[in-house]
Swiss-Prot record:
This is Phosphatidylglycerol--prolipoprotein diacylglyceryl transferase. It comes from Thermotoga petrophila (strain ATCC BAA-488 / DSM 13995 / JCM 10881 / RKU-1). Keywords: Cell inner membrane, Cell membrane, Membrane, Transferase, Transmembrane, Transmembrane helix. GO terms for biological process: lipoprotein biosynthetic process. PANTHER family: PHOSPHATIDYLGLYCEROL--PROLIPOPROTEIN DIACYLGLYCERYL TRANSFERASE, PROLIPOPROTEIN DIACYLGLYCERYL TRANSFERASE. A 1,2-diacyl-sn-glycero-3-phospho-(1'-sn-glycerol) binds at R165. The keyword Transmembrane applies.
Amino acid sequence: MKKILAFLSIAAGSTLFFVFLFIFLSKVFSGEILLSRYIFRIGGFELRWYSTLILTGFLISYFVARKRAKNEGINLEEFDELIFYGVIAGIVGARLYYVLFNLKYYRSLWDALKIWEGGLAIHGAVIGALLTGFLYVRLKKPSFTFLQATDLFTSVLPLGQAIGRWGNFFNYEAFGVPTNLPWKMFVPEPYRPVVYKDYSFFHPTFLYESIWDLLVFFMLSVYFKRYRKRHGEVTCLYFVLYSLGRIVIERLRVDSLMIGNIKAAQLLSAVLILLGFTGFLILRSSQEPKRAF
């Protein structure tokens, strides 16, 4: 009986949440409600939705990963130490990647350090975290392998990304080209690109990616628990699945980082798909024990 009541309570709470979210989004997307970047501002102190949602996504992902690490028999002190270094490297990598593609917008080093105002690139974060993880495993010789760590990391990363994308929502960024589809999103004129200043409604690409990230998280979670044969398989699948969605969604984005006439995210995603697919085939066909690599 208690289990039934608990299930009904969760179901009712979830239903109310999604009903509220639907109503709220419909008001924002129609332009009836205009968003603020700030949760509150008191004097010189301000708390932004962007940084709060990024932090929320990280914390939820961290606790899910930590539980999985415990089930894997990993030393949790070593796991926490890796996370500490990985987070620092991920933030630096995410910001550095973004700033390098937008140098003309940063007049000083201080401007480049203002990560709470937005401007983080997931590809830079992944590169920074992976490099740090590799060095940590090589130098520290912990209770886990590098690929075991990356599987834990990438199995929960899409969940954090799905939550973090809503920071773009409150910043009125990461939206797509103009559209008249029923789910079109109103963007105030100050946030519109100059070439689209006469348009009011745009693709909510932040929402597309958030939904895709959630789907990837659930797919990877099922694979992690039921079908994984070798460490590294989940990492490869993350590269493939996330990148497939990113390539499609990036086509609609109006604020993409560019390499010449090529969207950087699409180019890097294509490379990751190739690497992930190849790596997955190699790992699935490998006869080496699970702790290899």
